[in-house]
Amino acid sequence: FNWLATMWGGTIRFTTAMMFACGFICLFVLGGFGGLILALVAVDFTLTDTYFVVGHFHMVLVGGSVMLLFAMTYYWWPKMTGYMMSEKLGKWVFWLMFLGVFVTFFAMHLSGANGMARRVPVYFADFKFSNYLTTIGYAM
C-alpha cells in the first residue's frame, strides 16, 4: 500500500489524473477482496464457474489497467502536446466511468454469489434484475 503512503501527509489536489489514480486504488482493492474470498477452498469450490469470478477478474483488470491508462493520459497529455484537457469534462468522464465499472462488476459479484453460472445460453428469470444492473452499468 505504498500508493497510500505516498499521499499521506501531502497536499493532495484532486485533479482529473489524481481522481483516476484514486479510482484505481478503490477498484483494485474492492476487486482484490473478491480474490480473498475466492482463496477460501469451500467458497472457491462453490463459486467456480460463476459470475463472481468474472466480476472479480474484471474489476481488478479494468480497475487496474484502464483507470491507470486514463490517469496517465490526463497527466502526460498536456506535457507531451502542450494542450490542456478539460478538467470539468475529465471529472465527468471519471465519475461516469467509475460508477459504470463499479455497478457493472459489483452486480456480477452479487449474481455469482447467488449462483448465476457462466457459459450458459439462457439464464433463469431470477437473475433478470442483476443482468439489468450489469447492462445499466455497462451503458454508463
Annotated model-derived regions:
Residues F1-A5, T16-A42, Y51-G82, S86-M140:
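Hydrophobic cores of alpha-helical transmembrane segments in multi-pass integral membrane proteins
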Residues T6-G10:
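Short amphipathic alpha-helical coupling elements at transmembrane boundaries
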Residues F45-L47:
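Active-site-adjacent structural elements in folded domains
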